[in-house]
Structure formats: C-alpha cells, structure tokens
Regions:
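Non-catalytic signal-transmission and effector/linker regions of two-component phosphorelay proteins
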Residues: 1-5
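Two-component/phosphorelay signaling modules centered on CheY-like receiver
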Residues: 13-34
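Active-site residues of response regulator receiver
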Residues: 10, 57
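Active-site beta3 strand of CheY-like receiver
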Residues: 49-55
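Acidic catalytic/metal-coordinating carboxylates
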Residues: 38-41, 64-67
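Conserved phosphotransfer cores of two-component systems
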Residues: 27, 47-49, 71-79
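Receiver (REC) domain active-site loop signature in two-component systems and cognate sites
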Residues: 60
C-alpha cells in the first residue's frame, strides 16, 4: 500500500510532536516524512522531501500558514494543504 507523504508545520514543538505521536498515521494511509517550526523552515523541507500533503498552523513567526499555502500552490500545485 502506498502511503501519502505528509509534513506537519507548527511553531510549537509540543503540538507538532503531540500530533505526530497521538495519531496512527499509517492506519490512515499517511507517512509523516518531516516537520517544521515555521513556513520558512517548511519551504526547505517541502523541496527536499516532496510531500503529498502539508498540514500547517495558520499563525507562526517568519512566515504564516497562509503565505506558505500560497507559495505551495504556486510552486507545487499537486500538494494538498490542510490549515489548522
């Protein structure tokens, strides 16, 4: 079974790690391939890891989730974005 590759983006490490730990990603068809603490960090990870999905917080320092989403849609239109 091919798993969708997902990256989690949130400026609060406890939130990121908690989401990664508490959800059975594989049972839902996902593989967490990375995480990032802000939109700028996420840009590099997205280019390196080529995820299918990015799950991002909306409010973060340096680059917020809306700006990140806009960038993803322009550069990687096939990547789905979930904003929380």
């Amino acid at each position: 079974m091919n798993l969708y590759r997902i990256i989690l983006v949130d400026d609060e490490e406890e939130v990121r790690k908690g989401i990664i730990r508490k959800i059975d990603w594989e049972a839902l068809g996902f593989q967490v391939v990375g995480d990032a603490e802000n939109g700028q960090d996420a840009l590099e990870k997205i280019e390196q890891l080529e995820p299918d999905v990015v799950m991002t917080d909306i409010r973060m320092p340096y680059m917020d989730g809306l700006t990140l989403t806009s960038w993803i849609r322009q550069k990687y239109p096939s990547v789905k974005v979930l904003i929380f």
